[in-house]
C-alpha cells in the first residue's frame, strides 16, 4: 500500500490527537483538579478530572493498570493500522471510522504514558445525574465505532444485493 493511501488515516488521526491534547492541556492549565465550569446549566460542564481506569473507571484500582493499558492500546493501534489497510480506497466511511478510533486511542495513550491516567473534562448531566466525564479522544472513538458499524452494515447490504 502506498503512502498516499494512508492520507485519510494520517490526516484524521493527527487532527484528533492534536485537538485532544490541546483541549486537555487547556483544561489542565485553566482549571484546578475537580473544578467545574458550568457551560449549559444543569446539562453540560467543563470539569477537570483524571481517570485511572478505562471507560467508566473500569480497572482503575488494578495494580498493573498502567502497563496493561499501555500494552493493550499499543496492540490496538497496530491492529487498527492493519485494519485500515483492509479497506479499499473507495471505502471512505470505513477508512474515516478507523482513523477516528486510531486518533482517539493514540490521544488517550499519550495521557497514559505521560500521567499514568487520562484527563477527562466533558461532563454531560441532567441536574445531579451525571454521565462519566470524557474527552475528545473518547468522543472520536465512540463516533468512529458507530461509523465503523454503519460501514460494515452498509457493505453487508451491498454484498447481498
UniProtKB/Swiss-Prot annotation:
Subcellular localization, as worded in the UniProt entry: Cell inner membrane
PROSITE patterns: SPASE_II
Molecular-function GO term, any one: aspartic-type endopeptidase activity
Summary of the function given for this chain in its UniProt record: This protein specifically catalyzes the removal of signal peptides from prolipoproteins.
Pathway: Protein modification; lipoprotein biosynthesis (signal peptide cleavage)
Principal location: membrane
Superkingdom, natural source: Bacteria
Active site (record annotation): 120, 138
The protein's name: Lipoprotein signal peptidase
Membrane topology of this protein: Multi-pass membrane protein
Bilayer-spanning residue ranges: 64-84, 92-114, 131-151
Group of enzyme by EC: hydrolase
Name of the gene: lspA
InterPro entries assigned to the protein according to its UniProt record, in alphabetical order: Peptidase_A8 (IPR001872)
Organism: Syntrophotalea carbinolica (strain DSM 2380 / NBRC 103641 / GraBd1)
Family classification: Belongs to the peptidase A8 family.
Cellular component aspect of the GO annotation: plasma membrane
Keywords, comma-separated and alphabetical: Aspartyl protease, Cell inner membrane, Cell membrane, Hydrolase, Membrane, Protease, Transmembrane, Transmembrane helix
Catalysed reaction equations from the record: Release of signal peptides from bacterial membrane prolipoproteins. Hydrolyzes -Xaa-Yaa-Zaa-|-(S,diacylglyceryl)Cys-, in which Xaa is hydrophobic (preferably Leu), and Yaa (Ala or Ser) and Zaa (Gly or Ala) have small, neutral side chains
A single GO BP: proteolysis
EC number in record: 3.4.23.36
Amino acid at each position: 500500500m502506498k503512502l498516499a493511501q494512508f492520507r485519510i488515516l494520517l490526516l484524521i488521526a493527527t487532527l484528533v490527537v492534536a485537538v485532544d491534547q490541546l483541549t486537555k492541556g487547556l483544561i489542565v492549565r485553566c482549571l484546578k483538579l475537580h473544578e467545574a465550569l458550568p457551560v449549559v446549566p444543569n446539562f453540560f460542564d467543563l470539569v477537570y478530572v483524571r481517570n485511572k481506569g478505562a471507560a467508566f473507571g473500569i480497572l482503575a484500582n488494578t495494580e498493573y493498570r498502567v502497563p496493561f493499558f499501555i500494552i493493550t492500546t499499543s496492540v490496538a493501534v497496530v491492529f487498527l493500522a492493519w485494519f485500515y489497510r483492509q479497506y479499499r480506497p473507495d471505502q471512505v466511511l470505513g477508512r474515516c471510522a478507523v482513523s477516528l478510533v486510531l486518533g482517539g486511542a493514540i490521544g488517550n495513550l499519550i495521557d497514559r504514558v505521560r500521567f499514568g491516567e487520562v484527563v477527562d473534562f466533558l461532563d454531560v448531566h441532567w441536574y445531579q445525574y451525571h454521565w462519566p466525564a470524557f474527552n475528545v479522544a473518547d468522543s472520536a472513538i465512540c463516533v468512529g465505532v458507530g461509523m465503523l458499524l454503519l460501514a460494515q452494515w452498509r457493505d453487508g447490504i451491498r454484498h447481498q444485493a
